[in-house]
Amino acid sequence: MAEDQAPREETVEAPELTEAPEIDELETLRAERDELRDRFMRALADAENSRKRADRDRREAEQYGGTRLARDLLPVYDNLSRALEVATDEQRAAAAALIEGVELTLRELRNVMNKHGVRPITPQVGDTFDPQQHQAMFEAPVPGTKAGQIIQVMTEGFMIHDRLLRPAQVGVSSNTGA
């Protein structure tokens, strides 16, 4: 009987020795699984971020892609506006069709610019200077005005959607009191 018991004890001990390497292997596989899961989740997050970035870039390209063209058209707008401002009543009467053509061209240019999100910034004399939308071309003391008030508007400014395309050029009062 002693002989029967001895081999059984050895057999019992042998599985315990083989279980330890299996446990180590199981832990290794779990760690590898966790690492792969983490890498997979990071890859998913990167893909989602890339998709969002591409969507944002596409939207910005749609909104602001014509910025350079719009900026190049602003002198045309300015010149048409100036031509109408300086035309005297006699010139308007003598060249009514020409003046009407310039007015229609300017109106159409405004409509096209508006359609593409280009909007004028039209400060008025007496408004407060806003450095986000205005460019001070000069400062001068003017009686009856406060420092920082607009005293002259030289050119309109323009926004394209929510971005400044060109600041309005203005003269600003430098008075320290009212």
UniProtKB/Swiss-Prot annotation:
Which terms are listed as keywords in the entry?
Chaperone, Cytoplasm, Stress response
- Highest taxon of source: Bacteria
Compartments in which it is found: Cytoplasm
**Cellular component GO terms, alphabetical:** cytoplasm
Which stretches does UniProt call biased (Basic and acidic residues)? 1-11
The ranges of region (Disordered) come to 1-30
Task: Return any one Pfam family short name.
Answer: GrpE
Q: Which GO terms describe its molecular function?
A: adenyl-nucleotide exchange factor activity; protein homodimerization activity; protein-folding chaperone binding; unfolded protein binding
GO biological-process terms attached to the record: protein folding
Give the family this protein belongs to, as stated in its UniProt record: Belongs to the GrpE family.
Q: Which HAMAP family match?
A: GrpE
What function is annotated for this protein?
Participates actively in the response to hyperosmotic and heat shock by preventing the aggregation of stress-denatured proteins, in association with DnaK and GrpE. It is the nucleotide exchange factor for DnaK and may function as a thermosensor. Unfolded proteins bind initially to DnaJ; upon interaction with the DnaJ-bound protein, DnaK hydrolyzes its bound ATP, resulting in the formation of a stable complex. GrpE releases ADP from DnaK; ATP binding to DnaK triggers the release of the substrate protein, thus completing the reaction cycle.
Its quaternary structure? Homodimer.
Record's protein name = Protein GrpE
Organism the protein comes from: Cereibacter sphaeroides (strain ATCC 17023 / DSM 158 / JCM 6121 / CCUG 31486 / LMG 2827 / NBRC 12203 / NCIMB 8253 / ATH 2.4.1.)
The gene for this chain is grpE
